[in-house]
A protein has these predicted regions:
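Conserved HGGG/HGGXW glycine-rich cap/lid loop of the alpha/beta-hydrolase fold
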Residues: 13-57
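N-terminal cap/lid segment of alpha/beta-hydrolase-fold proteins
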Residues: 1-11
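A conserved short beta-strand
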Residues: 97-114
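Conserved acidic catalytic loop of the alpha/beta-hydrolase fold
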Residues: 59-76
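The feature captures the conserved acid-bearing segment of alpha/beta-hydrolase catalytic domains
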Residues: 110-169
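Hydrolases whose catalytic domains are alpha/beta-hydrolase-1, hotdog thioesterase
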Residues: 87-91, 113
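Gly/Ala-rich beta-loop-alpha elbow adjacent to hydrolase catalytic centers
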Residues: 79-88
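Post-His helix in hydrolase/transferase enzymes
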Residues: 162-182
Length: 184
């Protein structure tokens, strides 16, 4: 547990090689950081350091950056799983130079309407880094496709192959994250 700059405790798990490229994983709602252990193990095998930040509705870009600052992380690849992807998009769009890549699971850019027609943030700027969106349904695929106009960098939309969630698609998700950590 860590205390954020906003004064609330949040679960944070930092593991992997200390000198590896950092991957920040923003957990989905009702998923403990331990739910990402199998994914983190694969990422560690690729030489990557992982920081999993638990879900909390009070978590803001300011508090997420505060966590990274306290851990000495100046830049990373950011991964967001569903509700965590909402924050990941915002971080990637508003903290230029802090993130080298974005992987979002089942969420499009905040300016794109979701399945219910709602737009999460009309004012969210475009993302200027390489981005991958993994999707589990045709509706999310449509939102991901529409998000491309808000990404000024390499952009991929990938169907989740497993049983339609990140936990059961660990190998595929790890592969997509490793691709985003590469500078090629």
């Amino acid at each position: 547990m860590m205390t954020t700059v906003d004064g609330f405790a949040i679960s944070v798990a930092e593991t992997g090689p200390k000198n590896g490229t950092v991957v920040v994983i923003l957990a989905a709602e009702q998923r403990a950081p331990a739910a990402y252990d199998a994914l983190c193990e694969r990422l560690h095998n690729a030489g990557l350091r992982t920081i999993v930040i638990g879900a909390d509705p009070r978590l803001t870009p300011k508090s997420a950056i505060g966590i990274l600052d306290s851990l000495g992380v100046s830049w990373a690849v950011v991964v967001g799983d569903r509700t965590g992807a909402d924050l990941a998009w915002e971080l990637a769009a508003t903290r230029l130079g802090r993130f080298a890549g974005l992987v979002a699971i089942d969420r499009g850019h905040p300016r794109v309407a979701d399945a219910d027609g709602g737009v999460r943030d009309d004012n969210c700027p475009p993302v200027e880094i390489a981005t991958t969106v993994l999707v589990s349904s045709p509706v999310v695929r449509d939102a991901a496709r529409d998000s491309q106009r808000f990404v000024f960098g390499d952009y991929r939309v990938v169907d989740l192959l497993g049983r339609r969630n990140a936990h059961e698609s660990t190998a595929q998700l790890a592969t997509e994250i490793v691709l985003r950590t590469s500078g090629w």
